[in-house]
Amino acid sequence: MDPTISSLSTESTTLNKTGHPSCRPILTLSFLVPIITLLGLAGNTIVLWLLGFRMRRKAISVYVLNLSLADSFFLCCHFIDSLMRIMNFYGIYAHKLSKEILGNAAIIPYISGLSILSAISTERCLSVLWPIWYHCHRPRNMSAIICVLIWVLSFLMGILDWFFSGFLGETHHHLWKNVDFIVTAFLIFLFMLLFGSSLALLVRILCGSRRKPLSRLYVTISLTVMVYLICGLPLGLYLFLLYWFGIHLHYPFCHIYQVTVLLSCVNSSANPIIYFLVGSFRHRKKHRSLKMVLKRALEETPEEDEYTDSHVQKPTEISERRC
């Protein structure tokens, strides 16, 4: 599962081995990607600095911290990848091994980002559907433990995919296909988990017998999931089609890969913008620090009770007493 290598090696005026016209990467997209990635890295760096050093750690902040770390990792990979595309376009040599390592490294933050987003959505769904059970049985450091497991699993899948595709791809092709199948199946499972938990949460909040007032945290999560479905999911779908249907990266599919990468970079860059927009919406104070804005974006306080906290504290206290 390494479309980066193949798409970097295409030519514009020749025919490939299958007789299809090859194509060079679109130079406009190759220049857009580094611009978007630099902006996204700036935003995610601010989020990492605030959550890592300036704010008190909570369950949701641990998830958001790791999500920003995954987004930064993903943006770094594709920033370097875009520079290699530009170098390749102008005939500057780039070592094949660096392309192989970079192509497989990019799958690690993609898996971890989707996993963390699925974990956030699932936890919020459980807290809304079964609030008392959730507050009573949730381990104190569960978010940190889940994030560690996600990173370990993501690195394991990425390393195995790189090892079998780079070193044993020709001699042990069946093992490479098995690893790709596991990665693809895991991505499908994560997407179904994200979609199912988000849909259940949406139905419960908007259509339940007891409607829960919207909190800023729910708006933040909903917008993040929506942006992922629009911008982040196409890359996963492309990898799915690449594995199951054997789509080759000659004309015109090499352009599809570039577009999906650009959209995924937009997705990773948009998350900090979502946090700061939600946190600054209807803020009464004129002078707002980034720390306060980010803190408000992750608050579970409903909009109408934001300044009183009367309707939020009571259910939480009751559930904790029942534990």
UniProtKB/Swiss-Prot annotation:
One Pfam family, short name: 7tm_1
**Tissue spec. comment:** Uniquely localized in a subset of small dorsal root and trigeminal sensory neurons. Associated preferentially with IB4 class of small-diameter somatosensory afferents (also known as nociceptors).
The residues exposed to the Extracellular compartment are 1-30, 81-100, 165-180, 248-258
Q: Tell me, which GO biological process terms does this entry list?
A: chemosensory behavior; G protein-coupled receptor signaling pathway; hematopoietic progenitor cell differentiation
The topology of this chain with respect to the membrane is: Multi-pass membrane protein
Q: Where are the transmembrane segments?
A: 31-51, 60-80, 101-121, 144-164, 181-201, 227-247, 259-279
Tell me the first and last residues of the signal peptide.
none
Q: Does the keyword Glycoprotein apply?
A: yes
Keywords attached to this entry: Cell membrane, G-protein coupled receptor, Glycoprotein, Membrane, Receptor, Transducer, Transmembrane, Transmembrane helix
Q: Glycans attached where?
A: N16
Homology family: Belongs to the G-protein coupled receptor 1 family. Mas subfamily.
Query: Which PANTHER family does the record cross-reference, listed alphabetically?
Result: MAS-RELATED G-PROTEIN COUPLED RECEPTOR (PTHR11334), MAS-RELATED G-PROTEIN COUPLED RECEPTOR MEMBER X3 (PTHR11334:SF34)
General function of this protein: Orphan receptor activated by neuropeptides terminating in Arg-Phe or Arg-Phe-amide. Mediates its action by association with G proteins that activate a phosphatidylinositol-calcium second messenger system. Its effect is mediated by G(q) and G(11) proteins. May regulate the function of nociceptive neurons by modulation of pain perception.
What name has this protein been given in UniProt?
Mas-related G-protein coupled receptor member X1
Species name? Rattus norvegicus (Rat)
